[in-house]
Amino acid sequence: MADDKGGRSRRPGSALAVDLRRARRARRDAQKVSVIPPVPVTHGPTIDCADREPIACVREWFASEGWKPFPFQEEVWTAYLSGESGLIHAATGTGKTYAAWMGPVMEWLRDYPAPRPAGDQLRRRAAAPPLRVLWITPLRALAADTEAALRAPIEDLGLPWTVESRTGDTEPKVRARQSKRLPTTLVTTPESLSLLLTWTDTPALFEHLELVVVDEWHELMSSKRGVQTELALARLRQWRPQLRTWGLSATLGNLDTARDTLLGVGPDRHSRPGRIIRGLVPKGLQIDSLIPETMERFPWSGQIGLRLLPEVIQAIEEGKTSL
C-alpha cells in the first residue's frame, strides 16, 4: 500500500484508474460534439444511373470507394428484392451495413430510375419520400456513424432520400420537425421507437414503411430491450403485413433461434419464413504484444496489467472497431 499526502492509504494503480475514467469521459465528450447534423442530400449524383440496371450502379459505387461487393452482400440484395426477410451473420467489418442497405436503394433505383438533381435543402426535404426504412441500433453512440454510412451512397447515386436519427441526443427542433414528417430513413433505438409508436398518427407515419433493420441483434436478443424491439416489430407488422425485416449480427450461436425470434410468428401462429445468410469472408489475424519499455519492477500479482493500461487505451482508440 502507498500513502498519499493526507496520510491515507492508496491502492496500487489508483492513478491509472483515474486516467482510465478521464479517457472514457473524453471519448464521451468527443461523441457528443461529433454528432452529424440531420440534413438531406446537398449535392447532385456522382454516378449516372439512367437506363442502367441498379446492380450495375451499386457495383460502380463500390468501385468508386475502392471496394468490391462480397458474394454474401449480393445474396442479401437479391433476397430483399424478392421480398424476403432474414438474418445476416458476418464478422465485424465485413460489410453487414451495406448488405442490408443496398437492397432498398436498388429497389428505389428500379422503381424510380430518374434521379432528382440537388436543390435547396428545404425543398429537397419537402420533396423527399416518406419513411421507408427504419434502422434500429442498440447504442446511441452508433447512430451518428450509421447515419453517415447510410447517407454516403444515396448522395452519390442521386436518391432524393433524407436520413436522420432520433435518439435521446436528438435536438428538440429536429424532434419537432420529425413529429410532423419523418425522414425517408430513420435511425433510432428501441426506447425511442417505443415512444414513437405511442403517437396518435403513428399508423399514417408508417404507412409506406418497407424495411426494418435491427443492427447488432445479439446485443438485444434475450434482454428486456430485445423484448421491447420484438413488441415494436409486432405492432409495425399489424400495420404493414408485408414488412421486411433483416437482422445484423457478428456473434450468435443458435442462428435459427435468433432468426425466428427476430421475425416472430405469422397469423397462423407459425414462425415467419426467413433466410440466414452467412458472410464467410476470410480475415487475416495479426497479434501484437504490449510489453513494458522498462522492467525495473516485475510484479507477479497482476499489477503489470495496470501499468500498461495507458498503452491499452491508446491501442483501442487507434483501432477503428474494438471488441
Protein language model features and the residues they cover:
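Conserved pre-motif I regulatory segment
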Residues: 40-89
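Motif I (Walker A/P-loop) of helicase-class P-loop NTPases
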Residues: 97-107, 227-232
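Conserved SF1/SF2 helicase motif Ia
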Residues: 106-145, 239-242
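Conserved strand-helix element at the start of the C-terminal RecA-like helicase core
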Residues: 132-146, 247, 315-323
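Conserved helix-turn-beta segment of the N-terminal RecA-like "Helicase ATP-binding" lobe
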Residues: 142-165, 260-268
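Conserved motor-coupling elements within RecA-like helicase/translocase cores
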Residues: 169-186
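SF2 helicase catalytic motif II
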Residues: 191-194, 200-240, 245
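Conserved interdomain linker/interface between the two RecA-like ATPase lobes of SF2 helicase motors
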Residues: 234, 244-261, 266-323
